[in-house]
């Protein structure tokens, strides 16, 4: 996967389309969130693990927004960054608390691992995130 990313990145840089890398990664994250919120999450029978995984995306979204700053010379990136910042407002409405000793940080792969977390996310906030992801995905895929 890393080789494919590097090959695409190199090709786009050589052709002067560096910002496309940012848009590809952003689109992949939006699609993954859409799948999680539309296929994995069942509002009639909510699964705590699925809710936790959706909620933990607040950290990934923060990283994505930071990554997209590299491509602010592209107005399309700026446009979607504003949309993602709006989405981040929903994620900022709750906290996630990890138990001491339960959180493992893999600096090499840049991931957090935890067997569980306490969070303050409400059903209303979750529904707002789900709705906005659906709207954003529709805009990206059917402009």
Predicted regions and their residues:
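Extended amphipathic alpha-helical interaction segments
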Residues: 1-81
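A cross-kingdom marker for long, charged
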Residues: 67, 71-143
């Amino acid at each position: 996967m890393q080789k494919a990313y590097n090959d695409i990145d190199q090709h786009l840089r050589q052709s002067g389309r560096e910002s496309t890398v940012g848009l590809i990664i952003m689109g992949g994250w939006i699609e993954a969130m859409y799948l999680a919120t539309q296929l994995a999450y069942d509002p009639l029978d909510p699964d705590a693990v699925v809710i936790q995984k959706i909620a933990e995306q607040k950290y990934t979204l923060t990283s994505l927004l930071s990554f997209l700053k590299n491509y602010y010379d592209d107005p399309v990136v700026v446009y979607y960054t504003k949309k993602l910042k709006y989405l981040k407002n929903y994620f900022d409405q709750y906290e996630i608390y990890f138990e001491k000793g339960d959180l493992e940080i893999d600096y090499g792969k840049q991931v957090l691992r935890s067997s569980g977390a306490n969070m303050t996310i409400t059903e209303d906030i979750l529904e707002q995130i789900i709705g906005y992801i659906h709207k954003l995905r529709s805009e990206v895929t059917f402009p």
